[in-house]
């Protein structure tokens, strides 16, 4: 390991590659300061899947990407969409900075109210429940939250088990009810795998909705968003819940997720926003 000063002494010309993710303001500010003096690039490696957002990928999927772009509900969403593509292709931070906006703005789109039946898919330790409570001023009809990783679920119960009208489920979400092997040693990035070590009970959105017609769904399920959405087609078609869907885990999320939401219910208005994060994580679809 060498310091920046040592690198400057050893090399007259160099490029800095950032190979970690952060949303810590001080760290992001340091990266921005480095960019003023040096060429700084962020290699785009998807959280899930093996695709790379390169020229051949754009050629293969160009038509579907343009179709998704045309589904965006406002000009800001289209700008975010374009800048996300530019960033994924080039790794240049200027595109990332150009697409940033606050969570407050995104939740103005959702316009949550005191009668929401909230479904939190990927609840972790309860931070997104806190976010929901913030934007509903602690007034809601019900909360249903799923977290499959046993140790994390225990912390979720400790943090949120006393909330009124709240159901916490130690389950994963999938396109149908079954049992799947689950990689449970990755913390927040836990994934469903074919060669995992832990059996997890899975349920679909439509199965959960037999008891509660959810009005708002937040989904951050580490790369299986497309599969999970396909298990909620009936609820989306018949009741059109508000959606807050992570769309950055796989390269194909940028076009497949808007397409499946539109197919479920063409009346959805689909917005895209990116919140401060390096690399292009915390990029979500907000659908109403």
Mark where each language-model region is.
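Phosphate/nucleotide-binding beta-alpha loop and adjacent structural elements of enzyme active sites
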Residues: 1-288
């Amino acid at each position: 390991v060498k310091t920046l000063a040592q690198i400057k002494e050893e090399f007259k010309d160099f490029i800095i590659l950032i190979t970690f993710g952060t949303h810590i303001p001080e760290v992001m500010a340091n990266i921005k300061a480095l960019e003023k003096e040096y060429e700084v690039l962020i290699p785009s490696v998807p959280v899930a899947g093996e695709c790379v957002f390169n020229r051949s990928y754009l050629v293969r999927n160009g038509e579907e990407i343009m179709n998704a772009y045309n589904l965006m509900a406002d000009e800001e969403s289209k700008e975010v969409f374009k800048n996300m593509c530019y960033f994924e292709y080039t790794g240049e931070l200027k595109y990332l900075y150009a697409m940033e906006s606050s969570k407050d703005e995104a939740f103005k789109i959702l316009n949550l109210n005191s009668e929401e039946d909230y479904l939190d898919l990927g609840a972790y330790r309860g931070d997104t429940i806190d976010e929901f409570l913030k934007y509903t001023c602690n007034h809601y009809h019900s909360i249903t939250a799923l977290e499959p990783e046993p140790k994390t679920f225990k912390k979720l119960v400790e943090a949120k088990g006393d909330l009124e009208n709240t159901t916490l489920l130690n389950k994963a979400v999938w396109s149908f009810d079954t049992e799947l092997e689950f990689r449970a040693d990755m913390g927040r990035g836990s994934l469903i795998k074919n060669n995992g070590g832990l059996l997890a009970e899975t349920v679909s959105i439509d199965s959960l909705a037999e008891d509660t017609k959810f009005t708002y769904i937040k989904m951050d399920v580490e790369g299986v968003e497309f599969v999970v959405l396909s298990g909620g087609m009936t609820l989306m078609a018949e009741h059109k819940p508000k959606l807050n869907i992570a769309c950055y885990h796989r390269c194909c999320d940028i076009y497949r997720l808007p397409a499946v939401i539109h197919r479920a219910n063409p009346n959805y208005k689909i917005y895209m926003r990116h919140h401060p994060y390096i690399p292009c994580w915390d990029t979500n679809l907000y659908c109403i």
